[in-house]
UniProtKB/Swiss-Prot annotation:
This is Probable endonuclease 4. The gene is nfo. Zn(2+) 3 binds at H182, D227, H229. Its cofactor is Zn(2+). Belongs to the AP endonuclease 2 family. It comes from Bacillus velezensis (strain DSM 23117 / BGSC 10A6 / LMG 26770 / FZB42). PROSITE patterns: AP_NUCLEASE_F2_1 (PS00729), AP_NUCLEASE_F2_2 (PS00730), AP_NUCLEASE_F2_3 (PS00731), AP_NUCLEASE_F2_4 (PS51432). Binds 3 Zn(2+) ions. Keywords: DNA damage, DNA repair, Endonuclease, Hydrolase, Metal-binding, Nuclease, Zinc. InterPro entries: AP_endonuc_2 (IPR001719), AP_endonuc_F2_Zn_BS (IPR018246), Xyl_isomerase-like_sf (IPR036237), Xyl_isomerase-like_TIM-brl (IPR013022). Endonuclease IV plays a role in DNA repair. It cleaves phosphodiester bonds at apurinic or apyrimidinic (AP) sites, generating a 3'-hydroxyl group and a 5'-terminal sugar phosphate. The lineage of its organism: Bacteria, Bacillati, Bacillota, Bacilli, Bacillales.
Length: 297
């Protein structure tokens, strides 16, 4: 069965329950959350996440698998500022605890940025950080995200991800989040030869490592290294390629998560596209009037 959803908000007093209700309103049967704002480390106590009510609502609506995304501020690739590295290690540990408490098995992580020290140095630091964070027997996997190669990001090639995974002692606790926009922006031909890209990934990393799929179109041409998401079918990857990926038999059991932009001219009143994009992908039929329909909701 197709597992498809989007990023939803976990906030206010209802927290996980609010996230589940938002996902259901989009026709989703999975979803992804941040445990708090992605730009900071302020987090509620686990007992304040409203987990019991949230899980009950999920069960009522057939949602059995969700994903957590670690905040952007974690950078365990930083070799120039020890405080940044230590913050990343400590906070990732606590995020894994929250992920386990919520009942998610995957926490998506941007591997890290070398901030000018070079990819080789950054990758060594990421390996060091992951070896510090991972506890043997933990029931949460860290899903390293395929990156676009913007700035000094590490993980922009399958080889870099494979190097990180190989360096981690308990790498059974590592998986991969395959982002279509990032991989396209990194230079892989996701739009025209996804099977070729997937075969290359399988040879270098192993297809069984993919546990989350971020489904995004791209505003940029292949290899631009920009990381700018576009609505499904309105970017450089295109609807045909993305619906092929979403329904790919080798990725059938993997949760597909949309992170596409809100729509509308009024910056203060943009509308979420997810209900419309999920329906369109389920029906395998591109709707060229989709953006107008989203704006009109």
């Amino acid at each position: 069965m197709l597992k498809i959803g989007s990023h939803v908000s976990m906030s206010g007093k209802h927290m996980l329950l609010a996230a589940s209700k938002e996902a259901v309103s989009y026709g989703a049967n999975t979803f992804m959350i941040y445990t708090g704002a992605p730009q900071n480390t302020r987090r509620k106590k686990i007992e304040d996440l409203n987990i019991e009510a949230g899980r009950a609502h999920m069960k009522e609506n057939g949602i059995d698998e969700i994903v957590v995304h670690a905040p952007y501020i974690i950078n365990i690739g930083n070799t120039t500022n020890p405080a940044t590295f230590e913050l990343g290690v400590d906070f990732l540990r606590s995020e894994i605890e929250r992920t386990a408490a919520i009942g998610a098995r995957q926490i998506v992580l941007h591997p890290g940025a070398h901030v000018g020290a070079g990819a080789e140095t950054g990758i060594k630091k990421i390996i060091e950080g992951l070896n510090e964070v991972i506890v043997p027997g933990q029931n949460v996997q860290i899903a390293l995200e395929t990156m676009a190669g913007k700035g000094s990001e590490c993980g922009r090639s399958f080889e870099e991800l494979a190097e990180i995974i190989a360096g981690v002692t308990h790498n059974e606790h590592l998986s991969v989040c395959f982002d279509t926009c990032h991989t396209h922006d990194a230079g892989y031909d996701v739009a025209n030869d996804f099977d070729g890209v997937l075969n290359e990934f399988d040879k270098i990393v192993g297809i069984d490592r993919i546990k989350v799929l971020h489904v995004n179109d791209s505003k940029n041409i292949k290899g631009a290294r920009k990381d700018r998401h576009e609505n499904i079918g309105f970017g450089e990857i295109g609807f045909d390629a993305l619906q092929y990926i979403v329904h790919h038999e080798q990725l059938a059991d993997i949760p597909k998560i949309l992170e596409t932009p809100y729509v509308g001219e009024d910056k203060k009143n943009k509308k979420p596209p997810y209900r419309f994009e999920i329906e369109m992908l389920k029906e395998k039929q591109f709707d060229k009037e989709l953006l107008e329909k989203i704006s009109a909701q």
